[in-house]
Each structure stands twice: as structure tokens, then as C-alpha cells.
């Protein structure tokens, strides 16, 4: 429901409330030869995102990069991160980057606009949006997809 408030005595402004963020989930599978010591795992970053939105839900502020908090499941060789990022108008400016622990060597970079164009089942026009990204290292190649758990196979019964 819209909230109506007085801007001045003779004016009323209606503001529609809507979700101001996207949920981002990144999983990295088959990380190449990570060391056994702490701090040797690759790091995930989300680059070029808006740091805030104004009261009318418009992205604002200077584009910012965030280092994501990750969890590593050694038995599955699975690195995951979950974050909320502000809604932004231009997906082209946003990248998900996977770097060596030192932060110097870039292992993978995924442009959000390209990823969303290749995966139209992710609908960023909805109120609650989950953007799931799977980065898989396999046989010397890197494959970027939507995780299988996100794609729901529907078989209608007639």
C-alpha cells in the first residue's frame, strides 16, 4: 500500500514502497588447488554496485565494490556467498569477481548484464529477486550457469 505524507501543508506526495535490493547467491565449485591454511581460499567481490537508494527507491551514491563473506565446505569443494545488493538501473556496470586470496589474480569475472541476458528465468522486475550464480571449474575450463536447484522443471498434468 502507498504511504501518503505531507511535504508541505498544501501538498501531498504518494510514495510506493518496493524492495530496494536484490538477493545475490554465488556458489563456486571445483576451486583449483587451494592450500590447507586459512586465507588461501579465493575471494568473491561484487563490483560496481550502488551503495544506497533514496527514499523514492532510486539508486544513488558512487559505485562501490564489496568483498563478500564466504563459507567453504571442504568435503564438497564448495565456496558460497550470499549478499543483498541495492537495485541498480544498469546491470552492465556490475560484475561478480573471483580472485586468488592475494586479490591480485582474477580467476573469473561475470558481468551481471550478460549473465541475466543468458538466463531469462531470472526476472529482475519482480519485488523479491534472487540472482543465483554458479561458477564451476572443470577440466581446465570455467562454466558459469544458474544452479540446478534454482531451475524448476514443471511438467503439467493434463
Where would I find each of the regions flagged by the language model?
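Intrinsic-disorder/low-complexity, polar/charged segments enriched in Ser/Thr/Lys/Arg/Asp/Glu/Gln
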Residues: 10-12, 23-25, 78-80
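A short, Gly/Thr-enriched small/hydrophobic beta-strand-prone motif that recurs across taxa
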Residues: 18-32
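Compact mixed alphabeta submodule
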Residues: 11, 32-33
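Hydrophobic beta-strand residues in large extracellular and virion-surface proteins
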Residues: 15, 26, 44, 96-98, ...
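Short, low-hydrophobicity acidic/polar segments
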Residues: 1-20
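Tryptophan-paired
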Residues: 36-120, 158
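Hydrophobic, glycine-enriched assembly/anchoring segments
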Residues: 124-158
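Solvent-exposed, conformationally flexible loop/turn segments
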Residues: 6-10, 115-119, 126
Amino acid at each position: 500500500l502507498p504511504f501518503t505524507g505531507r511535504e508541505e501543508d498544501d501538498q501531498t506526495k504518494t510514495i510506493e514502497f518496493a524492495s530496494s535490493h536484490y538477493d545475490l547467491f554465488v556458489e563456486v565449485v571445483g576451486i583449483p588447488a587451494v592450500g590447507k591454511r586459512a586465507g588461501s581460499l579465493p575471494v568473491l567481490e561484487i563490483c560496481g554496485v550502488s551503495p544506497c537508494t533514496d527514499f523514492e527507491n532510486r539508486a544513488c551514491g558512487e559505485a562501490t565494490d564489496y568483498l563478500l563473506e564466504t563459507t567453504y565446505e571442504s568435503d564438497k569443494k564448495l565456496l558460497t556467498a550470499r549478499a543483498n545488493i541495492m537495485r541498480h538501473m544498469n546491470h552492465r556496470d556490475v560484475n561478480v569477481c573471483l580472485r586468488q586470496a592475494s586479490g591480485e589474480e582474477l580467476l573469473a569475472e561475470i558481468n551481471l548484464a550478460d549473465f541475466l541476458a543468458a538466463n531469462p528465468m531470472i526476472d529482475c522486475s519482480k519485488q523479491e529477486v534472487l540472482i543465483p550464480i554458479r561458477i564451476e571449474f572443470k577440466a581446465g575450463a570455467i562454466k558459469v550457469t544458474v544452479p540446478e536447484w534454482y531451475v524448476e522443471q514443471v511438467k503439467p498434468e493434463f
